[in-house]
Swiss-Prot record:
Name under which the protein is recorded: Single-stranded DNA-binding protein
Any GO MF annotation of the entry: single-stranded DNA binding
Encoding gene per record: ssb
Biased composition (Low complexity): 147-159
DNA-binding region, residue range(s): 54-60
Chain positions covered by the region annotation Disordered: 113-168
Pfam families reported in the protein's UniProt record: SSB
Motif Important for interaction with partner proteins, residue range(s) on this chain: 163-168
Self-association and partners: Homotetramer.
Organism: Brucella melitensis biotype 1 (strain ATCC 23456 / CCUG 17765 / NCTC 10094 / 16M)
Keywords: DNA damage, DNA recombination, DNA repair, DNA replication, DNA-binding
Organism phylogeny: Bacteria, Pseudomonadati, Pseudomonadota, Alphaproteobacteria, Hyphomicrobiales
């Protein structure tokens, strides 16, 4: 295969307020912990089961980090688009440690606020490249998910008559 794809899309809730810090270069970085959950009914017992996965997200895009700092709070529902990266470091005992994170680089990645708890911020989309570095209102046609032109009717995207209830 000539190419490969490293793309992660998450829709989940923040487990804590964003952690904001500055690198030695002065660049702003935001760290998020996002929970995604699923539930199902056990076929043998009929018991309802739940599982939550926690994801570490690192935002190196200054504009997206500012949005996270200003508008995101614990419990906020967000859409994140980034890439997987694994870091390696040594702990205090000299043991190799690894951490896999979803990373939004300076010119790649997307952050979209999905709930209205942030006073009118429903569906605000913030992207990390080209003209997508600006706010755009959620139009019900999928928002700004990297499309280069206007939405073409009902092909793709989200439908306005979908139930707001997430199945997990």
């Amino acid at each position: 295969m000539a190419g490969s794809v490293n793309k992660v899309i998450l829709v989940g809730n923040l487990g804590a307020d964003p952690e904001i810090r500055r690198l030695n270069s002065g660049d702003m970085v935001a760290n998020l912990r996002i929970a995604t959950s699923e539930s199902w009914r056990d076929r043998q017992t009929g018991e309802r089961k739940d599982r939550t996965e926690w994801h570490s997200v690192v935002i190196f895009n200054e504009n997206l980090a500012k949005v996270a700092e200003q508008y995101l709070k614990k419990g906020a529902k967000v859409y994140i688009e980034g890439a997987l990266q694994t870091r390696k470091w040594q702990d205090q005992n000299g043991n190799d440690r690894y951490s896999t994170e979803i990373v939004l680089q300076k010119f790649r990645g997307e952050l979209q606020m999905l709930d209205s708890r942030s006073e009118g911020s429903e569906g605000r989309s913030f992207g990390g490249g080209g003209n997508r570095n600006q706010m755009s209102d959620y139009s019900g046609g999928g928002g700004d998910f990297g499309s280069s032109g206007p939405s073409s009717g009902s092909s793709g995207g989200f439908s306005r008559d979908l139930d707001d209830e997430i199945p997990f």
